Amino acid sequence: MARYTGSLCRLCRRESMKMFLKGTRCYTEKCAFERRKYPPGQHGHNRGKLSDYGLQLREKQKVKRIYGVMERQFKNYFEKATKMKGVTGENLLKLLERRLDNVIYRMGFAMNRRQARQLVRHGYFTVNGKKVDIPSYLVRPGDIIEIVQSGKELEIIKESLALAEQRGFPVWLEVNAEEMKGKFVRLPEREEMQLPVQEQLIVEFYSK
C-alpha cells in the first residue's frame, strides 16, 4: 500500500497541531512545529478562512495522518463505524485506536505510530502468543501484546519504553515494562483519547 514519504514536520504544520510523527524530536525545541506554527507554503502566514467543506476535509486529513492511514482504508473504517451501535464519529476513533500499530505506540513500545508499523512488519510482536505482522490488525479487549525475545534487545524499543514510563500509560491499557508486554484492557472512552479533533466534521464530510 502507498505511504506518504514527504516531510513529517510539514504535515504537522499543515494541520496546525503537533501529531508526534517523529518520536523524540517532537518533545524537544528542535520540533519544526514549535518554531513555525503556521501552514507551509508561500501563503502559510495568511491562509484564508476555510469553507465548511474545507474544515471537514482538513479534519479528515488530520485524523488520517495521526494514525497513518490511507484514504481507502480510512473510508472502510468509517463505513464500518456507521454500522456499529453508538456515535459514528466515536466509533471511528475507537476502531483506529484498536489498530495493532497504534496499540504498540500507546503502550510505549515505539516512539511513534510510523515506527510501530515497521516493528510490526518485521515480526517483533505477538498477540495472545501468536506472531502478528499486520499493522492494521484490530486488537480486542483482553488481548495480550508481547515483544518477541529478539525484539527485547532492540535499543529503540528500550528507549521508547523508558520515555513512555515517564509520561505514563493510557488508562485503558496495562503495561508490564519489565516483561515488555501489555494488555488491551478495554476500549477507551472518547475523553480518554485526548485527541484534539472534531470527529463530527468527518461524519459530515462522508455524509454529503
Swiss-Prot record:
Is Ribosomal protein one of the keywords UniProt gives this record? yes
Gene3D superfamilies found in the cross-reference section = Ribosomal Protein S4 Delta 41, Chain A, domain 1, RNA-binding S4 domain
Indicate the segments forming the S4 RNA-binding domain, all copies.
Answer: 98-161
SMART domains of this UniProt entry? Ribosomal_S4 (SM01390), S4 (SM00363)
* Gene Ontology biological-process annotations: ribosomal small subunit biogenesis; translation
Q: Which GO terms describe its molecular function?
A: rRNA binding; structural constituent of ribosome
> GO cellular component annotations, sorted alphabetically?
small ribosomal subunit
Q: Quote any Pfam family the record assigns.
A: Ribosomal_S4
The UniProt keyword set, sorted, is: Ribonucleoprotein, Ribosomal protein, RNA-binding, rRNA-binding
Describe the function of this protein: One of the primary rRNA binding proteins, it binds directly to 16S rRNA where it nucleates assembly of the body of the 30S subunit. With S5 and S12 plays an important role in translational accuracy.
Name the family the entry cites: Belongs to the universal ribosomal protein uS4 family.
Which proteins does it associate with, and in what oligomeric form?
Part of the 30S ribosomal subunit. Contacts protein S5. The interaction surface between S4 and S5 is involved in control of translational fidelity.
- Name of the featured protein: Small ribosomal subunit protein uS4
Report the source organism.
Thermodesulfovibrio yellowstonii (strain ATCC 51303 / DSM 11347 / YP87)
The organism's lineage is:
Bacteria, Pseudomonadati, Nitrospirota, Thermodesulfovibrionia, Thermodesulfovibrionales
Corresponding gene?
A: rpsD
